Amino acid sequence: MEELTIWEQHTATLSKDPRRGFGIAISGGRDRPGGSMVVSDVVPGGPAEGRLQTGDHIVMVNGVSMENATSAFAIQILKTCTKMANITVKRPRRIHLPATKASPSSPGRQDSDEDDGPQRVEEVDQGRGYDGDSSSGSGRSWDERSRRPRPGRRGRAGSHGRRSPGGGSEANGLALVSGFKRLPRQDVQMKPVKSVLVKRRDSEEFGVKLGSQIFIKHITDSGLAARHRGLQEGDLILQINGVSSQNLSLNDTRRLIEKSEGKLSLLVLRDRGQFLVNIPPAVSDSDSSPLEDISDLASELSQAPPSHIPPPPRHAQRSPEASQTDSPVESPRLRRESSVDSRTISEPDEQRSELPRESSYDIYRVPSSQSMEDRGYSPDTRVVRFLKGKSIGLRLAGGNDVGIFVSGVQAGSPADGQGIQEGDQILQVNDVPFQNLTREEAVQFLLGLPPGEEMELVTQRKQDIFWKMVQSRVGDSFYIRTHFELEPSPPSGLGFTRGDVFHVLDTLHPGPGQSHARGGHWLAVRMGRDLREQERGIIPNQSRAEQLASLEAAQRAVGVGPGSSAGSNARAEFWRLRGLRRGAKKTTQRSREDLSALTRQGRYPPYERVVLREASFKRPVVILGPVADIAMQKLTAEMPDQFEIAETVSRTDSPSKIIKLDTVRVIAEKDKHALLDVTPSAIERLNYVQYYPIVVFFIPESRPALKALRQWLAPASRRSTRRLYAQAQKLRKHSSHLFTATIPLNGTSDTWYQELKAIIREQQTRPIWTAEDQLDGSLEDNLDLPHHGLADSSADLSCDSRVNSDYETDGEGGAYTDGEGYTDGEGGPYTDVDDEPPAPALARSSEPVQADESQSPRDRGRISAHQGAQVDSRHPQGQWRQDSMRTYEREALKKKFMRVHDAESSDEDGYDWGPATDL
């Protein structure tokens, strides 16, 4: 006897225990020895006991492949599972093969399975029922196809004449892929086995889950594959252009290959025994289904592609439901592994004639119940047609996570007359698939159809799945990131700021005081920074969010929205009425556009669909706070192989500095972190182009402590601690939604630096919320240049020393200076030092006194600490009293408005960003 190790694939649906979780411990991964993700422990009495075993290799979690994933990524995926998790594992199993002698004429063969003599038979557990209750055409397993022999190929069951050279290069057994088992050869002809499963009660399940795997059935002599000699007939295709082919339908595979643009990359697994290409066909007059082997659809799809494909409702089009036995909590990818169109394209013409020719239902043509039953499919899938009246008469349940189901039928409605019942799943309406639609989108689509229009519904009876869905209260499931601010509305309305992430569970949740869902609200759960779910409540739906975001932008534009203050409005109005804002009108008018306007310019929707992914590149690092310059220098000096400061370039139309996005990309290609010194608006830009920077903010303890820390770290630095401290306070107030992590600055130790390095290492390995949809090509083509509208906004939001006030109060009401001298010329640089200047006066560009250009710099724009007013030399003597009154008014209001920021200035006004002020 010869021993052979095979891999069996199992899928377990685990319910989360409040105390034990899922009851498993995992180890391994790409970053650990061995590489495979394995179950290292099973908690006794936990949800996984008896279902998973120690040593199981984890293949997939909730439809997310664990191949090449790190252990941290797998742990975070499991943490995001709220109630249930669908875990697919593969388990090694040893079988014994009868010893056979190798053929002397075939020295290249490595083991006894390669002999031509013996034939193969099914294992003893093969008769567990391949028919099941599946509606799948492309989701059938290899075991199912192995039981369907066809005429004309029975004599070739053991032949290897179609093998290509080198087919026996691998010595060991073939691992399982999606349920495929390599069967030992016996002296008995392999025969199909028919199994019939009959439900005694509606609550019973067939208990069969079908899978699929794409393989190479035939290689033409004139194609590139024949000349390449790297592919052979029977090879299992594991990846197509880097995308896993597991559970892909043939129609999805065809679309994937069509997008290859002349270059096709395949990762294959060699089938040395040529098992798949030598499956005996079923006899046409037998009881087995006469449907062709599923792999034959590949040639038909390539020869006669459909004339048109209906566009998906929002996301990439996926396949309809796979099986009536699917669990409602399974991953959408596993539930949608079959395809209606892939099984109907290959129908004979005599079967297609059953539907009227005038129907436009060509691609998704579904045969009658009788023909589907004859072909081995579920008899429940059928087509229903009726004219829409004033109402459809259907109540819908479910969502994008489980599918759309009928939860109620109005008596006497057209739908009731066509036999639609509670528990029917709606697969398609008027050529539009319903598999990926939320409940709100499905209802809006049906309500949007005009009365009198003919409706064509593809439905399937799934009462058992429907009742499971109702009991488990599942339906919609997707994640969003907010891009506007909303105040909480008690008792159940959640508030949020820009950048918050929510898990949406129901898109038609009843609002406060409503007994039935009327739309307008979503049930959502806030996701914390640790990827754990927090409080649950309702948020506005998509259309309502767009209205609120537009209203917020309009309010902030006039200075009455969130973040504005009455005092700042009064101060701005006071100076505006007296015409004393010298040369600042244009600047302040442009600088009204804050981050909300930037979000609108960046084409962010109010809600952005996001998914949790692991970064495949070194993310750029943005360090904000009063010691950012010191931290960047220390990182590049200590670890030059991991960090690099992004180079700045000058604008062509202004002396300001910018960083090109192409510079960030080049540094990432070097496998380094790009260190950036940019504005919050530039951070928004980086997030929009999906660079997802790690933003670390240093929180100063106090201004004296900050001054002592900078003198200890950089004694030669001449930067003003007053300005750095004020800048940090503004950043913390207006841009905290952009921070990835914060580090307090306490004392004069270097613990902040060690914590910074630890945060960067941790954040690089953690999964991040990324946009569900990729960027369009037009934006990627212009990454080397700043966005036009964004560049203008960024320039307005950067620091301009000419419009900043230099007065501060020390708590006693008096004015003092931190020793900074400013030039009030036309854009000249300012000096920012902690040494006191020779004169105890400050230059303020916002002062109402207009200086004559012929005056000396000492006299121009200065106010003596002991002099009440200064007469403008350009004014006539008759205006001295008016100027004196203005000076008196200014002095009277100075204390009142000293600490209030001008509403006309942006959140970034007054920031000292260094050479890189824009991105």
UniProtKB/Swiss-Prot annotation:
Modified residues (Phosphoserine): 112, 136, 164, 169, 203, 319, 327, 371, 591, 856, 905-906
PROSITE patterns the UniProt entry points to: GUANYLATE_KINASE_2 (PS50052), PDZ (PS50106), SH3 (PS50002)
One Gene Ontology cellular component annotation held by this UniProt entry: nucleus
Cellular compartment(s): Cell membrane; Cell junction, Tight junction; Nucleus
Keywords: Cell junction, Cell membrane, Membrane, Nucleus, Phosphoprotein, Repeat, SH3 domain, Tight junction
Ranges of biased composition (kind: Low complexity): 791-801
Biased composition (Gly residues): 812-828
Residue ranges of every copy of the Guanylate kinase-like domain listed in the record: 580-761
Membrane topology: Peripheral membrane protein
Biased composition (Basic and acidic residues): 117-131, 332-360
Biological processes per GO annotation: cell-cell adhesion; cell-cell junction organization; establishment of endothelial intestinal barrier; maintenance of blood-brain barrier; positive regulation of blood-brain barrier permeability; protein localization to cell-cell junction
Subunit structure comment from the entry: Interacts with occludin OCLN, claudins and TPJ1. Interacts with PATJ. Interacts with UBN1. Interacts with FASLG. Interacts with CCND1.
Function per UniProt: TJP1, TJP2, and TJP3 are closely related scaffolding proteins that link tight junction (TJ) transmembrane proteins such as claudins, junctional adhesion molecules, and occludin to the actin cytoskeleton. The tight junction acts to limit movement of substances through the paracellular space and as a boundary between the compositionally distinct apical and basolateral plasma membrane domains of epithelial and endothelial cells. Binds and recruits PATJ to tight junctions where it connects and stabilizes apical and lateral components of tight junctions.
Family as reported in the entry's similarity comment: Belongs to the MAGUK family.
Name of the protein this chain belongs to: Tight junction protein ZO-3
